[in-house]
From Swiss-Prot:
The chain crosses the membrane at residues 115-135, 139-159. This is Archaeal Lon protease. Belongs to the peptidase S16 family. Archaeal LonB subfamily. Homohexamer. Organized in a ring with a central cavity. It comes from Methanocaldococcus jannaschii (strain ATCC 43067 / DSM 2661 / JAL-1 / JCM 10045 / NBRC 100440). ATP-dependent serine protease that mediates the selective degradation of mutant and abnormal proteins as well as certain short-lived regulatory proteins. Degrades polypeptides processively. Its main location: membrane. GO terms for cellular component: plasma membrane.
Length: 649
């Protein structure tokens, strides 16, 4: 399984602390992103959730210091005395140091009533001293001088009080502190700034609302209400925007302007705010743009913006099941255990994680790269090993679907994560909402479904296989075909809503009629007038939307059975698509469908030969691969009991 032998992950070396070394399966994408950043090119990363888009950007952010020299800078906001609604924002190279020269001198304020009272008491005490201790010949001069000092001092106090009151009554009065520049941002190393596309204020900046009108002396001046956006904080660095599906069109226009002009002003975003009338000068924002999203998110971007993205990278969601890649997956397991302080995992547990990676990839020779999902399974298996039940596990999911385990405080009693713990998490589906819904549906509805495996042969009755939604759970569908004499021949589909399914059933009907009419099948010949046959096809007890072409072979065989009145054996289930030449084509979800056939108790399952490379488990049921419809006919028709077969049930 792995190139190294071990009993538990405790014996394995610790993973590298560098994120760039912890990226699994996306090495080519990492090289391209590094090259793009080095050459100052814009990048968009597309791929399934959990394949490592954000991790790649974080890993690149850790080594930004290696991309040449960087000049630190800081951003300050100053008032514009000519127009207070147009504050000035400056980007200044160097490290920020608050200069005492920038501190404005405060206006002299009128003394308080307490100060005046103390001055009066002091004057009275001074007068008492002079009257009591000074000689009579100096008394008149001393009193005169004291009176003049008190008079001058009182005049100054009254004058400053009057001027202060008159200044306070002015509508545009500015306190000197309101003239002081404000530090908005200080950048000491090359920045990597992350922002979500839906948060316009965080991305583009804003002007805060002032309930007092935004004008001194009561209000806060505009330059003190500026919120710098991520687009400006990323100056001389990287701006990483995720969730591009939620990006409004107006935000795309602003980003496009910033990419073109390398500068962008900040204005009030809320038209009902006092900041709506405020706009700064254009602020430098020369950055490298990296965006990420799912595959279909790219269609929400404007063409001019998409044209300015130099590298469009699609991340892989699978990798080949080789010894080298299994070792990488083992490295990932060790990383998760180390980073989340989990219990060690046994060798069998690691092998079970690899098996689950095969299932999630849908093939025996592939391993999934949806590593966030695997990480959730590993963390939940750790909790199962510690004795937690399902309800406790479900309570540790966050809004984004990521699982956060509780760390084990007491490790005196060593606990190991085994294959049984990992398998329990996977089989119960607690890592996926869709799988839980599908499992509950099957559990509650299975006893009502009229499916009788290994029953007597029947005419026009066959069992097909399907996968329920996105949960990855297979199910068995009973298909019934009935032929009626009619003047208006045709094919009628019951309980089928998907367009692909309708087209595939039409193909199956046409192919079955062609084969019966040409009498080329290895079956008893029978003259049939197809011009007066009305065909009804029912997917029995199917209440959800049915789509896809994997039931084409099953429907074709059921129609042939009904037309020729030859019974079909009931000990098998079948899946596979067909072309008009009768070739059996590959389908998806083959492992889930085989599991469904085993769960219902069928002895055999027939699948396309092209899907044999995808089959993971072969025990418990006979798996028959086929290439053409001619190979299937001898396997499924009961030619010995034609007369006594049931029509349908």
């Amino acid at each position: 399984m792995f190139s190294i032998k071990f009993k538990t992950t405790e014996e394995l070396p610790e993973p590298s602390p560098r994120l760039i070394d912890q990226v699994i399966g996306q090495e080519e994408a990492v090289k391209i992103v590094l090259s793009a950043v080095k050459n100052k090119r814009n990048v968009i990363l597309l791929g399934d959730p959990g394949v490592g888009k954000s991790m790649i950007v974080k890993a690149v952010g850790e080594i930004l210091s290696d991309f040449g020299e960087f000049t630190p800078y800081y951003v300050i906001a100053k008032p514009n005395l000519k127009n207070m609604e147009r504050p000035i924002v400056e980007v200044i190279d160097g490290e920020y140091k608050e200069d005492s020269k920038d501190m404005p001198k405060l206006d002299f304020k009128a003394p308080s009533s307490t100060t005046l009272l103390l001055i009066m008491i002091g004057a009275i005490l001074l007068s008492e001293y002079l009257l009591k201790y000074l000689p009579q010949n100096y008394l008149l001069a001393a009193v005169t001088i004291t009176a003049l000092i008190v008079l001058i001092f009182g005049f100054v106090i009254i004058l400053t009080s009057i001027m202060g009151a008159s200044r306070a009554s002015m509508p545009n009065n500015l306190n000197p502190m309101d003239l002081k520049p404000v530090l908005l941002y200080e950048c000491k190393k090359r920045p990597l700034v992350r922002a979500s596309a839906y948060n316009v204020t965080r991305l583009l900046g804003d002007i805060k609302h002032c309930p007092l009108g935004g004008r001194p002396p009561l209000g806060t001046p505009p330059h003190k209400r500026i919120i710098l956006g991520a687009i400006h904080e990323a100056h001389r660095g990287i701006l990483y925007v995720d969730e591009i599906k939620t990006m409004p069109l107006e935000v795309q226009d602003y980003i496009l302007t910033a990419l073109q002009d390398k500068q962008l002003p900040i204005s009030g975003r809320n038209p009902n705010s006092s900041g709506a009338t405020v706009e700064t000068n254009p602020i430098p924002c020369d950055f490298i743009l990296i965006m990420s999203g799912n595959m279909d998110d790219v269609y929400n971007l404007r063409a001019p913006l998409l044209d300015r993205i130099d590298y469009k990278i699609v991340l892989k969601n699978k990798m080949d099941n080789t010894l080298e890649n299994r070792d990488k997956l083992l490295q990932f397991i060790v990383q998760e255990i180390k980073n989340n302080n989990l219990n060690p995992m046994t060798y069998d547990g690691c092998c079970e994680v690899v098996r689950i990676a095969q299932y999630l990839a849908g093939s025996k020779d592939k391993l999934t790269l949806r590593l966030r999902l695997l990480a959730n399974i590993i963390k939940m298996a750790n909790d199962v090993a510690m004795g937690k039940d399902v309800e406790e596990l479900l309570g540790n999911f966050d809004d984004k679907g990521e699982y956060h385990p509780e760390t084990q405080k007491d490790k005196s009693n060593k606990v190991y994560i085994t294959a049984e713990h990992v398998r329990k998490v996977f089989d119960t589906g607690i890592y996926s909402m869709e799988k839980q819904v599908a499992l509950n549906y099957i559990k509650n509805f299975k006893r009502y479904k009229h499916i009788v495996p290994n029953d007597e042969p029947k005419v026009g009755v066959i069992y097909g296989l399907a996968v329920l939604g996105a949960g990855g759970i297979g199910d068995v569908t009973k298909i019934i075909v009935q032929i009626l004499e009619s003047k208006n021949p045709g094919t009628h589909l019951l309980n089928i809503s998907g367009d692909i399914a309708k087209h595939s059933i039409t193909l199956a009907s046409a192919l079955s009629k062609k084969l019966v009419a040409e009498k080329k099948l290895p079956l008893p010949k029978k003259d049939i007038d197809l011009n007066n046959k009305e065909i009804y096809i029912q997917f029995s007890q199917s209440y959800s939307k049915i789509d896809g072409d994997s039931a084409t072979a099953a429907v074709c065989l059921a129609i042939i059975s009904a037309l020729l009145d030859i019974p079909l054996k009931q000990d098998f289930a079948i899946t596979g698509s067909l072309d008009l030449s009768g070739n059996v084509l590959a389908i998806g979800g083959v492992n889930e469908k085989i599991e469904a056939a085993k769960r219902y108790g069928f002895k055999r399952v027939i699948i396309p030969e092209a899907n044999m490379i995808d089959v993971i488990e072969t025990e418990g049921i006979e798996i028959i691969p086929v290439k053409t419809l001619d190979e299937i006919v001898p396997l499924v028709f009961d030619l010995d009991n034609r007369g006594g077969a049931e029509r349908f049930n």
